[in-house]
């Protein structure tokens, strides 16, 4: 009699799944962590809510109202979740029938869209971006049949550029009555003028993902948002966990979204943008750097000579970057988070010493 292993009992798509390679999962023994697009220094908060004997609100009122005011939308258009990553998954769970519907995304881009779909058993379709990393609208149009959710990251991770707003409008017209278009705005605080939040009234099928992990310097909090029209939010509320935010998370999130918290965030953005421009200028003068791409974010994508050797050399010196070689069209590319001036200098000095 054949023995059935525990793995044999698992769903086939889970057995075949490659988990998302997060920065922490990839590890390393660094002291300069520039691989996860985090804010480089600690922002201090004090807990004010001590009612830990009680379950929290499903959608904490102070968090929802503060975020709605910050984003310029109505509270009914906001859903808070465990990071934007949960928002990615909720949209698939609410709109895609496993084994029947598909999602579509445009690589090179963020890796969680495919992981979330594959976990749920939903087909992934890809339409690689054009040479300038803008949308291939004809390619998308050709593949839309059976697609229920389209993910577009803008500014795009890992390339750092904004998607042309006219292309977004064309995509929203192409998908009207057919699919939800999800604009992933995890990095929008670094270029707030480009947000699509003002478009919600025009497009009932638009959803926008946001996070406190980047400019708000709270990656360890795991708090993100979905902005959408009330009909979409109500559907997501059917599939979200009953208590997605713990009481301490809601407490700190509400503080971060207070008027003082918003001012502090904008000061951090100004500082990071100045540091980004310093690092870009320095990288352009280094011999092992072939090309530095423009960025609207808190990270820089650059193409290197012998990028694997450079990546390993810096890794061995405790400087952890993000290797993008496996992404379509990113051969030779490494992504560098903008950190402190001291961290930038460590990177610059290490790269100048490379004999490539």
Curated annotation (Swiss-Prot):
Disulfides per UniProt: none
Gene3D superfamilies with a match to the protein in the record: Aspartate Aminotransferase, domain 1 (3.90.1150.10), Type I PLP-dependent aspartate aminotransferase-like (Major domain) (3.40.640.10)
Presence of keyword Transferase: yes
GO biological process, one term: L-histidine biosynthetic process
InterPro entries: Aminotrans_II_pyridoxalP_BS, Aminotransferase_I/II_large, HisP_aminotrans, PyrdxlP-dep_Trfase, PyrdxlP-dep_Trfase_major, PyrdxlP-dep_Trfase_small
Catalytic reaction annotation: L-histidinol phosphate + 2-oxoglutarate = 3-(imidazol-4-yl)-2-oxopropyl phosphate + L-glutamate
Sequence similarity: Belongs to the class-II pyridoxal-phosphate-dependent aminotransferase family. Histidinol-phosphate aminotransferase subfamily.
Name listed for the protein in its UniProt record: Histidinol-phosphate aminotransferase
Species annotation: Escherichia coli O81 (strain ED1a)
EC number of the protein: 2.6.1.9
PROSITE patterns cross-referenced by the UniProt entry: AA_TRANSFER_CLASS_2 (PS00599)
EC top class named in words: transferase
Subunit record text: Homodimer.
Swiss-Prot/TrEMBL keywords: Amino-acid biosynthesis, Aminotransferase, Histidine biosynthesis, Pyridoxal phosphate, Transferase
């Amino acid at each position: 009699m054949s023995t059935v292993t525990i793995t044999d009992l698992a769903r086939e798509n889970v057995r075949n799944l490659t988990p998302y390679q997060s920065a922490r999962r990839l590890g390393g023994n660094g002291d300069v962590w520039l691989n996860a697009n985090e804010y480089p220094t600690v922002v201090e908060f004090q807990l004010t809510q001590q009612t830990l004997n009680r379950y929290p609100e499903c959608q904490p009122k102070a968090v929802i109202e503060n975020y709605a005011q910050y984003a310029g939308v109505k509270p009914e258009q906001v859903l808070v979740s465990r990071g934007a990553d949960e928002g990615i998954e909720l949209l698939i769970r609410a709109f895609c029938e496993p084994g029947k519907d598909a999602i579509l995304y445009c690589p090179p881009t963020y890796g969680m869209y495919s992981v979330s779909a594959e976990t749920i058993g939903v087909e992934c379709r890809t339409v690689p971006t054009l040479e300038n990393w803008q949308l291939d609208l004809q390619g998308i149009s050709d593949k839309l049949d059976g697609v229920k959710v389209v993910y577009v990251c803008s500014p795009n991770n890992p390339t750092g550029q904004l998607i042309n707003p006219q292309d977004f409008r064309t995509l929203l017209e192409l998908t009207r009555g057919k699919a939800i278009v999800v604009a992933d705005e995890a990095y929008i605080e670094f270029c707030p003028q480009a947000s699509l939040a003002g478009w919600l009234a025009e497009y009932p099928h638009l959803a926008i993902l946001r996070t406190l992990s980047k400019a708000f310097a709270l990656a360890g909090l795991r708090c993100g948002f979905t902005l959408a029209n009330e009909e979409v939010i109500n559907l997501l509320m059917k599939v979200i966990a009953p208590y997605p935010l713990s009481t301490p998370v809601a407490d700190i999130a509400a503080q971060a979204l207070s008027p003082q918290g918003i001012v502090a965030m904008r000061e951090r953005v100004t500082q990071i943008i100045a540091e980004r421009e310093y690092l870009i200028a320095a990288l352009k003068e280094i011999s092992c750097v072939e090309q530095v791409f423009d960025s609207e974010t808190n990270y820089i994508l650059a193409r290197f000579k012998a990028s694997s050797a450079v990546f390993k050399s810096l890794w061995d010196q405790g400087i952890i970057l993000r290797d993008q070689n496996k992404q379509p069209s990113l051969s030779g590319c490494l992504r560098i988070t903008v950190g402190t001036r001291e961290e930038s200098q460590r990177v610059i000095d290490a790269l100048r010493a490379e004999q490539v």
